[in-house]
């Protein structure tokens, strides 16, 4: 592949990555505490969309804080996994073969 062709392919890949990032803003990921008293929804780009807290948790600030930390960490981990998997797939699919760069996305 010539240099101009590679540059064109890289621009195409960049656009596909940007399109994927926009699409990931619409992918919702849910997580809840083990007992279902706290529910959090984020996008695959790790933006919090909603938090639902059962009234019983409002009586114990420390417990609520613990629930928030644990549940937020879980949902962010899930979102990060989806995000990385989707962006990696786009990059792998469209990256031109550049000598010496074979292991870049492994």
Curated annotation (Swiss-Prot):
Signal peptide interval: none
Subcellular location: Cytoplasm, Nucleoid
Sorted UniProt keywords: Cytoplasm, DNA-binding
One Gene Ontology cellular component: bacterial nucleoid
Stored SUPFAM superfamilies: YbaB-like
Pfam families named in the record: YbaB_DNA_bd
Gene Ontology molecular function: DNA binding
DNA-binding is among the record's keywords: yes
Domain of life per record: Bacteria
Protein family (similarity comment): Belongs to the YbaB/EbfC family.
Subunit structure and binding partners: Homodimer.
Task of the protein: Binds to DNA and alters its conformation. May be involved in regulation of gene expression, nucleoid organization and DNA protection.
The protein's name: Nucleoid-associated protein Fjoh_2555
Source species of the chain: Flavobacterium johnsoniae (strain ATCC 17061 / DSM 2064 / JCM 8514 / BCRC 14874 / CCUG 350202 / NBRC 14942 / NCIMB 11054 / UW101)
Lineage: Bacteria, Pseudomonadati, Bacteroidota, Flavobacteriia, Flavobacteriales
